[in-house]
Amino acid sequence: MNKLTTFLLMAAFITFGLLTTQGEARAKAIELKFGHVGAPGSLFLACADEFAKRANAKLGDQAKVVTFGSSQLGKDQELLKKLKLGTIAFALPSTVMSSVVDEFGVFEMPYLVLDRNHMRKIRDEVFWSMIAPKVEAEGYEVVAVWENGFRNITNNVRPINTPADLQGVKLRTPKGEWRVKMFKAYGANPTPMALSEVFVALQTGVIDGQENPFTQIFSQKFHEVQKYLSLSGHVYTPAYLLTGKKTWDSLPADVQKILKDEAVGMQEWVYETAEKMETDLLNKMKDSVEINEVDKQAFVDASGPIYQEFGTKVPGGKDLIDKVQALVK
């Protein structure tokens, strides 16, 4: 074999090796599966897709966020398990987080969060320092605080004006301890159920009603099988961009930074989008359901025992409530 042939063979092997290495690098781009329960038209889906768009534009070939809505990857509890196992990268839980860490239950206190400006203060001055760190011991990491929204009651029995009108109403709630306690205190018969099961349960009369933000009510088509929408606004529920510690700690630092920056950076976009959707969707539902205002003071007056129990049962619960309420001033 002459020198020229040897040189050409070596060059070919080097070129092949470089191409193979580059191909393998591209093949190793990390797929970050993002599962959530939001249906088309929901705030959850809008937020997940916006995050994927923003993050993927910055991640290049390093990683890619891929979203799966409508409970395709599981219901809330199943998604939490998959996060911990590392089989998915992100989820967007809301009320269910109070079953993971007790302190998240503060967001189940009725009429505690007054508006989005109040929520901004709670997020920045209470949540990140007093609540978010506690999920790490459970195998999770909160990346950002987004929104589920202000919750309102729909049902097929009667318009709800005061807690007394809820007497005996079979009302679907999420699987959160304090939401169940709250509606029991109001006289309803709360029935915890996964979001994906609610439409059929309403349609068949297994339950009489449910409570959710407008974006969930409309996107899940609950207004099509309900007679009354009562504007209770009884609870504001955040949603949390959540990842598993196993997945998060395995990501390169620069990928973590991009994901964190984009998730936190779109928090204002989330609030603005949610506010616009509230107005638009209420108008769209006016022809489908009978809408009424409620006597909010009557609900506030009936909520005292829930605050008291949370304050005594959850370590530091009263202090947490006090700090949140102090931010109104």
Regions found by a protein language model. Give the residues of each.
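N-terminal secretory/targeting leader peptides
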Residues: 26-118, 127, 133-329
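Short, low-complexity disordered leader/linker segments with a strong preference
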Residues: 1-31, 329
